Amino acid sequence: LNIFTNNLEGLVLDHRYYAGGCSPHYIVDTRFRKPYNVESYVPETTGKYEFTMTEYNSYSNYESFVLKAKAEQSGFSFGIKIPGVFELGYSSNDNRFQKFIQRMKRFSSTSSNFIHARSELAVGVYKLKPQSLMLHYEFQQRLQQLPVEYSYGEYRELYRDYGTHYITEATVGGIYEYTLVINSQELQKAGYSLSDVQKCAQYGFNIGANIYQVYGKLGITEAGCKSLLKEIGDSTSSKRFVEDFIVLVRGGASEHITALAYRDLPTAALLQEWGDAVQYNPEIIKLKAEPLFQLVTPRDLAQAAAIKENLQRALEEFQLESSSCHCAPCQGNGIPFLRGNKCECLCPLGYSGPACETSKRTDAAVNGNWGCWSSWSSCAGGERRRRRLCKNPGPETDAGSACSGPDAETLAC
């Protein structure tokens, strides 16, 4: 796993090695043999097809809490010791993520409101043994070929081919989420609030719920909820309140993902089918990870201490090199990302060109984006420090949103 891009890279562990053992496990009714490296696999049945909903009254708030959480885990500090469980973000190369971003970014300069809904289904948790792991033969050969005298270029190639971390524990399953883009002005004219839309959607989407039996408890009339839900659930209607309905799905067979993505309002039966498909086609949704250098032991390498130290040193350089902060800003609030060692822009709908420079729109305010972190300071008082500036680009005065996240970090030393 490349923790900076969310790309799954080459195999570092041999999951076809069984050490002569035969430990049968089951996924639903499918029997499989547990590999030597796996300590445990526990089936899960959590998730009830219920949606957790959150309101955002501006695009900048939505972007800070939803979009940037999906893009990349770029805030990890040097040492890259990731604490606890975190959600696997989307790679910028993921076609699902690209389409989602392109549709969402076109609302970056509007006064729209947003409702983000999410339903998570976990089907299993697997955990690796804490030590004595069997390395994949090709990865072990690459480690043995690394020079004892530090040469960043050769260590960088290892990280490019195999990623920066290996997954020690993972929750597999599926996530169905959608975003409602609401015309705040029309909503206000009709006397509705964003909370009214959320309440109607909450009851209307949850499996087994009948909105017309509970409308009295919502503080909104039956006619009001019918009007709002019709716009969400009918892609052919002329929509006054709902500007867009954007779906993003992980896990399940491709035909079910396609069906969900092209239906405005998924039915209970379709969600159940998707859930059944997730059992046999899950994706990693949460994980724990350790840096690759933790796999370097004297058991596998004669010069283990030197190689491990070199890998740690190279990881800091690789993190700086892998960041899109080196890229020039994209226009129209496009997102810069690295494809290999080349900067590219993911443009919002309505923008095109290498830097998203071609558009007929003139209303897009420029939002701020972080520049690169500075180098770590020398150790003083048991701490090292580094800073970054919101100038890549800086936010447009009185219109663009500022960068989210801290502008300084400290590290014990």
Model-derived segments and their meaning:
Residues 238-245, 327, 338-342, 348-349, ...:
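Thrombospondin type-1
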Residues 100-101, 356-358:
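A short, polar/proline- and glycine-enriched secondary-structure boundary/capping micro-motif
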Residues 1-331, 337:
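Membrane-permeabilization and membrane-interfacing ectodomains
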